[in-house]
Each structure stands twice: as structure tokens, then as C-alpha cells.
Amino acid sequence: MEKFAPEFHGEDANNRATKFLESIKGKFTSPKDPKKKDSIISVNSIDIEVTKESPITSNSTIINPTNETDDTAGNKPNYQRKPLVSFKEDPTPSDNPFSKLYKETIETFDNNEEESSYSYEEINDQTNDNITARLDRIDEKLSEILGMLHTLVVASAGPTSARDGIRDAMIGLREEMIEKIRTEALMTNDRLEAMARLRNEESEKMAKDTSDEVSLNPTSEKLNNLLEGNDSDNDLSLEDF
């Protein structure tokens, strides 16, 4: 049968723990330094000595290391910590490298109302050439956007891998946008063709029907006879419908 260590509870366990800490307290403490102050921290009624180290300012960037040879604070060297990141002041509008790019962007997308909205001829034109022409213009605009974004990325100070990653992501986004626009345009073209066929069928029916007479189906004739004759023998049943 296995043997287990004895268990202690209550006051007996507290006394044994206190004796154990007092027995090992001298093994881990270093010789006292007259220049360092000692503080006592009480943890669960057990006194443990903690050596107070030299202070380091936490809210300042200046570190004052302790010099054991000099006792005066005036002779202690001050080390200025260098900032991890340095920022330059914003350039003036005339020196801004992106001002020309911004101007070209505004000029590219300004005053393009004819290309950005459907005209009357484009709405009534059912040919595939119209859709293809619009897709070509969309592709051209997206290519210009990609070129300007690429220029902006190259102008910025970044690693080569980051620039390549952004360029690849923008190319993938461009291809995805073109595919979505192409699919939507083809669906629109199919709808327009279906509407044109229905319109042609209605026009053919109207052209063939030149008489002013209106023909009634069998159910309508029975209803008409019932209203005109007022005869009980002409009552309708559910089977008539």
C-alpha cells in the first residue's frame, strides 16, 4: 500500500510553514549593503526581507545609474534615451509630393458625366458592342486607378516586399471588380434582349388583330347568357369553371 506524506491543518500547518521559512531565510539573502535600504513586506503574517534596488524613473526618458564611487548626485552622468521612431514635420503644400498626384486624380474623374451615366442611345441600343465599349472604358478607368495607386506606393518610403504585396493585392482586386462588372453587364444585356423580344411579340399580335370585335371564351359566354336571359336553367355550377 502506498504511503502518503502526513497532512497538517489549522494552526499546526501555519506554525510548521513559519518555521520552514525562517530556516531558509538566511540561505537566499545577500550581505547587506550600507548604501541600500531594506524594506519589510508582510505576507500572511510572515516577514520577508526585500532589498530595495536603485530607482529608475518610469515617467521620464532619463536614466540615472547608481555610481558607488561617487556619493554626490551632481557627478552622476545622465543618459538621454533616443526615441525609437522619429517623425518629420509635414511639408508645405508646395513641397507636398502627393499634390501633383491629387491634382491628376481630380482631373481624371472630373467632368465625365457622359461616360458615367447612360444616354438615351445607350439605353435603346441592344447590341453587344455597346456593352463591350462600356467595359473597355471601365477597364481603362480601373487601370488608371491602379497606376496612381502604384505611383503612391512607390513614392512612399516602405520596404520592397510591402510595395510588392500592395501591388499584387490591388491587381487581384482590379481583376475581381472587372469580372463582377462584366457579369452584371451581361445580365443586364440578357434582360434587355428579353424585354425586346416581348415588345416585338406584342407588336406582332397588335399588327395581326385589326378587327374591333371581342371574342368570349366559353365561360364568359355562359355568364353573358345568364345575365341576358335571367333563366334558372342557365345557372352555373362549379364544373363549368
UniProtKB/Swiss-Prot annotation:
Q: What is the effect of changing Y102A?
A: Complete loss of interaction with protein M2-1. Almost complete loss of viral transcription and loss of localization of protein M2-1 in inclusion bodies
- Region feature Important for viral particle assembly, mapped onto this chain: 39-57
Region spans: Oligomerization and binding to RNA-directed RNA polymerase L: 120-160
* Mutagenesis or variant effect for L236P: No effect on the interaction with the N-RNA complex
Q: Which GO terms describe its biological process?
A: symbiont-mediated suppression of host NF-kappaB cascade; viral life cycle
Site positions (Interaction with protein M2-1) are: T108
Q: Which GO terms describe its molecular function?
A: RNA-directed RNA polymerase activity
Locations of Polar residues compositional bias?
Answer: 58-67, 213-223
* Region called Binding to monomeric RNA-free nucleoprotein, residue ranges: 1-30
The annotated region (Binding to RNA-directed RNA polymerase L) lies at 216-232
Keyword tags: Host cytoplasm, Host-virus interaction, Inhibition of host NF-kappa-B by virus, Phosphoprotein, Viral RNA replication, Virion
* Domain comment, as recorded: The N-terminus is important for viral particle assembly. The oligomerization region is central. The C-terminus part contains binding regions for the RNA-directed RNA polymerase L and the nucleoprotein.
Q: Identify this protein by name.
A: Phosphoprotein
Species annotation: Human respiratory syncytial virus A (strain A2)
Show the taxonomic lineage.
Viruses, Riboviria, Orthornavirae, Negarnaviricota, Haploviricotina
